[in-house]
Amino acid sequence: MNNLNKGDMRRSQYLMFFSNKKENKSYNVGQLVGLILGPLLFVLTLLLFQPDNLSDKGVFVLAITLWIATWWITEAIPIAATSLLPLILLPVGHVLNPEEVSAQYGNDIIFLFLGGFILAIAMERWNLHTRVALRIINTLGTSTGRILLGFMIATGFLSMFVSNTAAVMIMIPIGLAIIKEANELKHGDTKPESISKFEQALVLAIGYAGTIGGLGTLIGTPPLIILKGQYQSAFGEEISFAKWMIIGVPTVIVLLFLVWIYIRYIAFKHDMKTLPGGQDLIRKKLSELGKMKYEEKVVLIVFLLASFLWITREFLLKHWTFTSEVADGTIAMFISVLLFLIPAKNKEKHKRIIDWEVAKDLPWGVLILFGGGLALAKGISESGLANWLGEQLKLIEGVSPLVIVLVITIFVLFLTEITSNTATATMILPILATLSVAVNVHPLLLMVPAAMAANCAYMLPVGTPPNAIVFGTGKISIKKMASVGFWVNLLSIVVIVLVVYFLVPPVLGIDVTQPLPLK
């Protein structure tokens, strides 16, 4: 312990507090409270809550929702396990039959995300993601500002197609290597505090860029795929991959640029203009990768093919007779099968580009959570609970939509600092779908900012895995992360509200003052 510096001690204490208790006990205090509170709310709702104009089935679904939401928030049992409850409770309450419930777990949306995961695993297996990232950084130059921006662009781009966590885990070791090189090669006129500020800026910028980049595509982050699924389930309308990119990519670009300016020139302002050895290290790592291998080329071609099909489906494939019923999930499965089909040249390592061994690396729990959320939303709709909630929410009719959007964005963004972003989106979006009918606005005016905000957690290590990875480097304290993250939260709120008001309506072709009827 005597050899630990203050940062190491803080990190050790933090990790002990949040992990050791879980290792030594089956349940921590919060989980025990949730474990009891969930079923208790279920029973009390059934016994004591009998409002007018709400059927017994509606009351039953409300009770289920409170139980599931409590377990999701407290993580009393694994979130994915909680997401299996609709399969049990909805048929028991005669709300939906087993076939109707289980069909939600096989929704096209889930297969879109599954295909995205498989493509990401293929990129990681053959190291294409590292080559792309290093190329981007190498292109942008040697100044500290450009290196910082290069890392953010590379991480943000990767995060559009692989998980936020994977993107950050790829980039952090490269960033730490550059920091180490800078410390070893620092010039006599380079102040130690300048290097310290730069290393804090770099690791935090990588973490934030991983979170921001997820907003770029529908497969970039779970809240967006939940948005697509819940919107389609509630209203029978679709958000296409291509149209979301027209919204998401500019959002990512603007946020990355604003956060880069804030981190480089305000939060971690320093006098070091160039980084000793930084460019040389990047070139060395590129050299170590060697020439692009056959397998990398195959994955790149399949990736470009998938992107082309997703982007053109709306205005090209839909107009061809034999592809008119093709959905984004269909394309995802097509590219997945291609990756399983194409042989690899390096057969000592793997016989094909990917094989079924990758199945163990797929986040099945996330896919089950999606299914549980869709099943619960179906139950809310079919039981009449959605219409009843809409009637109750008419109390806020007449409030400015801008105020509602702002409040939703702030509430969800700060809520997701302490709860799972996926669980938050799964809980909040069906409620907002109903709220849109009550306040006479288009549902996407409320659902889009909530989904985007659910992805944005910058203040705490527990807020999102990228933050935890950054904190784990020992380069940044919780206090500093919270103070910097607070201002990044505010930047995100402003950008999200502006995007929702000025970009979403024309791109998606909606009139924000026209509500949609629930299915």
Curated annotation (Swiss-Prot):
<comment type="function">
    <text>Mediates the transport of dicarboxylates across the cytoplasmic membrane via a Na(+)-electrochemical gradient.</text>
</comment>
<keyword id="KW-0406">Ion transport</keyword>
<feature type="transmembrane region" description="Helical">
    <location>
        <begin position="490"/>
        <end position="510"/>
    </location>
</feature>
<keyword id="KW-0769">Symport</keyword>
<feature type="transmembrane region" description="Helical">
    <location>
        <begin position="103"/>
        <end position="123"/>
    </location>
</feature>
<protein>
    <recommendedName>
        <fullName>Sodium-dependent dicarboxylate transporter SdcS</fullName>
    </recommendedName>
</protein>
<feature type="transmembrane region" description="Helical">
    <location>
        <begin position="322"/>
        <end position="342"/>
    </location>
</feature>
<keyword id="KW-0739">Sodium transport</keyword>
<dbReference type="Pfam" id="PF00939">
    <property type="entry name" value="Na_sulph_symp"/>
</dbReference>
<feature type="transmembrane region" description="Helical">
    <location>
        <begin position="395"/>
        <end position="415"/>
    </location>
</feature>
<feature type="transmembrane region" description="Helical">
    <location>
        <begin position="451"/>
        <end position="471"/>
    </location>
</feature>
<dbReference type="GO" id="GO:0008514">
    <property type="term" value="F:organic anion transmembrane transporter activity"/>
</dbReference>
<dbReference type="GO" id="GO:0005886">
    <property type="term" value="C:plasma membrane"/>
</dbReference>
<feature type="transmembrane region" description="Helical">
    <location>
        <begin position="297"/>
        <end position="317"/>
    </location>
</feature>
<feature type="transmembrane region" description="Helical">
    <location>
        <begin position="362"/>
        <end position="382"/>
    </location>
</feature>
<feature type="transmembrane region" description="Helical">
    <location>
        <begin position="201"/>
        <end position="221"/>
    </location>
</feature>
<dbReference type="GO" id="GO:1905039">
    <property type="term" value="P:carboxylic acid transmembrane transport"/>
</dbReference>
<feature type="transmembrane region" description="Helical">
    <location>
        <begin position="428"/>
        <end position="448"/>
    </location>
</feature>
<dbReference type="GO" id="GO:0015293">
    <property type="term" value="F:symporter activity"/>
</dbReference>
<keyword id="KW-0813">Transport</keyword>
<keyword id="KW-0915">Sodium</keyword>
<keyword id="KW-0812">Transmembrane</keyword>
<feature type="transmembrane region" description="Helical">
    <location>
        <begin position="159"/>
        <end position="179"/>
    </location>
</feature>
<comment type="similarity">
    <text>Belongs to the SLC13A/DASS transporter (TC 2.A.47) family. NADC subfamily.</text>
</comment>
<feature type="transmembrane region" description="Helical">
    <location>
        <begin position="29"/>
        <end position="49"/>
    </location>
</feature>
<feature type="transmembrane region" description="Helical">
    <location>
        <begin position="241"/>
        <end position="261"/>
    </location>
</feature>
<keyword id="KW-1133">Transmembrane helix</keyword>
<feature type="transmembrane region" description="Helical">
    <location>
        <begin position="59"/>
        <end position="79"/>
    </location>
</feature>
<keyword id="KW-0472">Membrane</keyword>
<dbReference type="GO" id="GO:0006814">
    <property type="term" value="P:sodium ion transport"/>
</dbReference>
<keyword id="KW-1003">Cell membrane</keyword>
<dbReference type="InterPro" id="IPR001898">
    <property type="entry name" value="SLC13A/DASS"/>
</dbReference>
<feature type="transmembrane region" description="Helical">
    <location>
        <begin position="136"/>
        <end position="156"/>
    </location>
</feature>
